[in-house]
């Protein structure tokens, strides 16, 4: 849907978070419609700039939906809600700020190319690295989506490129696809919003559903689940990375065919797994005909994102790593493999039917993991799985009552054996315990900063 199609329509903004507020500001600034209802699932204090609009919450949602023509939905609102399914059947049109941006840019700004990256893990770092290297080579680039600014704010920016991180929530109801897409991987995650794992994977892949013959998609050949579902899109322009005749990661190095491009040890990024994603990023840069060797040099100045294998402090030989972004066992497995020396790993969050068997095997097979600490709702299941799958007698397994206890126990253990890494890699979402992974990561940082340095 184009913005001009919203002119004088009866509109509902569903969800007054960051995206909802940006959408409302855009409609207001361009005088697109004055017949707008704001709906939030729970009561909230409306910012003063929006006080002129009707605000609803907790009322008869079905009646409200039937009273409007268009709903601009926030990403947190699942497309699988019964109310949405019924409203669509009654002719109510649903869109989002992401879809509005993609529509406007692709149909009205042909000079601007949209590059969108998604995946279960690695999308934020991939998007940020791509943006960093494009800016370094002098391109006019906007950054938005699930990172940076809401995409609707970039429509009037006059950019030549828009680099977007797209979540499964944002991809699920797209009606326009980006010019260039990249998939990092698919893991078992987020089934609550999507109802099933298959829905989750197909919602991710909807990012390329509307790509045409001039568009392109880069796919990580090394991720089995991604390749299982991408096979449904054989008719699209799919190009694979992490293959021998293209960009691929080997050990701590990134290659193009037989030529070494960079070494992870020359970067500020922690984690060899980042090279898998950089193979996709460099594939995009090559497609844009940018200088690959210059890009490799520019990566050396790239600053890692907070809460993603973030080095917090070193105290008495113990290094504290904040990986709060880790919301799946696969992320923690990659994190463990990223470090040498003694490791105490802290994991646990909300229980969302994750399978921790591979995580337990990783701990069992890595004798450098001296202690595993579990906590929160999923803690008992993680501990039970480790006990069942691990044969190690030297592994210390602690079920903590709080994050503070987990940090202190890990610190004391590693300090007593000459130092090491305290790795906070939760393996599960934070909802119910923290507002988001950033708040969770900051709590870890605050605890570390209060430790006794003696």
How would you describe each model-predicted region?
Residues 1-116, 137, 300, 306-310, ...:
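Short, basic phosphate-binding NTP loop
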Residues 2-11, 22-26, 30, 264-369:
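Nucleotide phosphate-binding/pyrophosphate-handling subdomain across enzymes
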Residues 17, 42, 147, 222-223, ...:
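Residues in the short beta-alpha loop(s) of Rossmann-like NAD(P)-binding domains
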Residues 27, 71, 117, 146, ...:
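Residue-level signal for inorganic ion chemistry
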Residues 28, 62-66, 75-221, 225-236, ...:
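Phosphate-binding loop of NTP-binding sites
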Residues 31, 174-177, 207-213, 232-234, ...:
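Short, conserved loop/helix-junction motifs that constitute active-site signature segments
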Residues 36-41, 217-221, 346-347, 368-377:
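Short internal beta-strands
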Residues 357-418:
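C-terminal helical cap/extension that packs against the catalytic core
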């Amino acid at each position: 849907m184009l913005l001009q199609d919203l002119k004088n329509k009866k509109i509902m903004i569903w969800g007054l978070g960051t995206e909802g507020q940006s959408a409302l500001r855009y409609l207001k600034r361009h005088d697109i419609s004055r017949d707008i209802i704001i709906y939030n699932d729970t009561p909230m204090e409306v910012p003063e700039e929006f006080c002129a609009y009707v605000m609803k919450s907790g009322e008869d949602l079905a009646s409200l939906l039937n009273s409007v023509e268009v709903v601009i939905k926030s990403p947190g609102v699942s497309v699988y809600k019964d109310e949405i399914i019924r409203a669509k059947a009654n002719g109510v049109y649903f869109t989002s700020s992401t879809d509005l941006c993609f529509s406007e840019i692709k149909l009205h700004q042909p000079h601007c190319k949209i590059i969108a990256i998604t995946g279960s893990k690695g999308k934020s770092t991939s998007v940020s690295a791509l943006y960093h290297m494009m800016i370094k080579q002098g391109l006019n680039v906007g950054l938005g989506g699930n990172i940076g600014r809401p995409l609707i704010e970039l429509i009037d920016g006059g950019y030549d490129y828009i680099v977007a991180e797209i979540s499964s929530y944002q991809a699920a109801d797209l009606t326009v696809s980006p010019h260039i897409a990249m998939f990092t991987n698919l893991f078992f995650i987020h089934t609550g919003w999507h109802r099933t794992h298959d829905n989750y994977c197909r919602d991710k892949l909807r990012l390329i559903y509307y790509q045409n013959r001039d568009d392109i998609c880069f796919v990580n050949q090394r991720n089995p689940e991604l390749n299982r579902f991408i096979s449904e899109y054989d008719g699209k322009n799919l190009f694979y990375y992490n293959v021998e005749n293209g960009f691929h990661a080997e050990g701590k190095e990134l290659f193009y065919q037989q030529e070494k491009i960079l070494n992870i040890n020359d970067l500020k990024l922690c984690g060899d797994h980042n090279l898998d994603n950089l193979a996709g990023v460099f594939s995009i840069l090559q497609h844009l005909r940018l200088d690959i060797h210059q890009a490799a040099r520019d990566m050396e100045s790239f600053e890692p994102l907070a809460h993603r294998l973030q080095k917090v402090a070193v105290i008495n030989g113990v290094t504290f790593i904040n990986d709060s972004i880790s919301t799946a066992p696969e992320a923690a497995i990659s994190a463990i493999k990223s470090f040498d020396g003694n490791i105490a790993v802290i994991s646990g969050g909300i229980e969302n039917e994750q399978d921790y068997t591979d995580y337990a095997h990783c701990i069992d097979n890595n004798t450098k993991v001296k202690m595993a600490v579990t906590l929160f709702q999923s803690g008992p299941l993680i501990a039970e799985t480790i006990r069942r799958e691990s044969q190690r007698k030297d592994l210390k397994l602690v079920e903590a009552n709080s994050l503070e206890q987990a940090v202190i126990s890990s610190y004391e253990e590693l300090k007593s054996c000459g130092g090491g890494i305290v790795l906070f890699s939760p393996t599960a979402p934070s909802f119910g315990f923290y507002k988001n992974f950033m708040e969770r990561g900051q709590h870890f940082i605050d605890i570390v900063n209060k430790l006794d340095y003696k």
